[in-house]
Regions:
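Conserved Lys-Pro-Asp/Glu-containing loop-to-beta segment of HAD-superfamily phosphomonoesterases
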Residues: 317-344
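Acidic, divalent-metal-coordinating active-site segment for phosphoryl/phosphodiester hydrolysis
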Residues: 339-355
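Short catalytic/ligand-binding loop motif for oxyanion handling, primarily in non-cytosolic enzymes
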Residues: 1, 31, 36-43, 73, ...
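Substrate-recognition element of Asp-dependent hydrolases with the DxDx(T/V) motif
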Residues: 243-296, 305-309
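Active-site neighborhood of HAD-like aspartate-dependent phosphohydrolases
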Residues: 159-208
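C-terminal accessory extensions appended to soluble enzyme cores
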Residues: 74, 108-150, 234, 346, ...
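ER/Golgi luminal nucleotide-sugar-dependent glycosyltransferases, focusing on the catalytic module
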Residues: 1-150
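A metal-dependent, Asp-based hydrolase signature
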Residues: 191-194, 198-249
Length: 399
């Protein structure tokens, strides 16, 4: 709080500079840069993702939904009223907010502070980030200060860090290997294209597939696998008769699209060669044989355990899978490595378990100066075929 207040109101010169940004630079939102007391993972949605997606829809924000981003962490900021007018127009009342009970995440307030920059830019204003200790003291739109130490860490340093532990757990997707598309849902758009070519059926497969998965999860919960999902799709009047063939098509496509994150596979292999116990875990609807084949293709082998949500009926994203894992692997000798800030890091940190966050290829792109390329994979001005093609090209370049 002291850092934030000093950054925003510390001197007359500071306030003059802030008002100059409002007057001359079309500033709508001005807030402090990262402070060392805030963990790196805070610059993501964490437990607020579902609410964040809902707010993107409510406020009609057509920007890509990010995995990492800047926002006024701690809710200290200057703002132009017009820049945040859509929030004022919501007329939130005290009753809309959860009762304060020491929550550190997952409340309306936590979601609101994260949505501010996106509303500001939708309103046609700029966001500025103040970094009083940096050479560049005023940054527009983006800062990577929170990730400075992460970017210093090389492969050998990570191996040394992880080798302190006897049991190393790895997430699979976007950690050890990744799909050669920008977003996992792009696989379903590729399926739409394949269905049209093979069956001459024009369908929005992504919508159908996600609806089927939601219905399957409602019935089968964490045990949901790809057969459950396609069991739901088999009832669709347009593509139901092809459901079995489409299931095989999706499995085959996932296999073809997967490619290793070479540095991370080398980290994995180095730890395995040291005799460490290495387990792999994922929230996934594909079965063990399918995942094992993908791991083999990506040169990941000799793991000690492969734990999948659909096989054990427990998930990382609600913490239940960790309870099962720690029945067999003592947490005091344990570290987990993964890309998801919530399920691979925050949940473990809250339970006193060590974790290490690896940024996904998409997150790295979002932090770069080339994040605008993501627009080419979702802009409605492009046809679906063009967006899919752009996703494939960008996915290959990223990975």
């Amino acid at each position: 709080r002291q850092y934030s207040m000093e950054t925003l109101t510390g001197s007359p010169a500071t306030i003059d500079e802030i008002f100059k940004l409002f007057k001359e630079e079309n500033a709508g939102l001005i807030y402090p840069d990262h402070n060392d007391e805030i963990p790196l993972i805070a610059y993501s949605w964490l437990a607020n993702e579902a609410r964040g997606r809902q707010m993107f829809r409510e406020y009609d924000i057509d920007a890509p939904f990010p995995s990492v981003f800047n926002y006024p962490a701690g809710s200290f900021f200057w703002a132009r009223t017009e820049a945040l007018k859509p929030i004022f127009d919501k007329y939130y009342s005290l009753d809309d907010f959860e009762v304060e009970a020491g929550q550190t995440d997952g409340t309306l307030a936590h979601a609101l502070e994260r949505i501010l920059p996106f509303i500001c830019e939708k309103q046609g204003f700029e966001q500025f980030i103040l970094s009083p200790m940096e050479e560049q003291k005023v940054k527009q739109h983006k800062s990577t200060l929170a990730f400075k130490e992460y970017f210093k860490l090389d492969k050998q340093a990570l191996i040394m860090e992880l080798s302190q532990y006897e049991i190393i757990s790895f997430d699979i997707f976007d950690t050890l290997f990744t799909r050669s598309v920008v977003d996992p849902d792009d696989v379903f758009d590729l399926m739409s294209e394949a269905i049209y070519k093979k069956y001459n059926k024009k369908v929005d497969f992504k919508t159908l597939r996600k609806k089927a998965e939601a219905e399957a999860v409602e019935e089968n919960e964490a045990f949901t696998n790809i057969s459950h999902i396609y069991g739901k799709l088999s009832k669709d009047k347009t593509i139901g008769e092809f459901a079995t063939a489409l299931k095989d098509m999706e499995i085959d496509l996932e296999y073809k699209l997967c490619q290793p994150r070479k540095d991370m596979v080398e980290v994995y292999s180095a730890l395995k060669s040291m005799g460490k116990t290495v387990i792999l875990t994922s929230d996934m609807y594909l079965s063990k044989p399918h995942i094992a084949a993908m791991l083999h293709k990506c040169h990941v082998s000799y793991y000690d355990d492969l734990i999948l949500s659909c096989e054990v009926g427990a998930r990382k994203d609600d913490g239940s899978i960790w309870e099962l894992i720690f029945e067999h692997y003592p947490k005091e000798y344990f570290v987990h490595v993964g890309d998801n800030f919530r399920s691979d890091s925050q949940i473990l940190m809250d339970n006193g378990v060590k974790s290490f966050t690896v940024l996904s290829p998409k997150a790295l792109l979002e932090l770069s100066d080339f994040s605008y390329l993501l627009d080419y994979t979702m802009d409605s001005r492009f046809t679906r075929s063009m967006r899919v093609a752009n996703s494939l090209m960008l996915g290959h370049a990223l990975n």
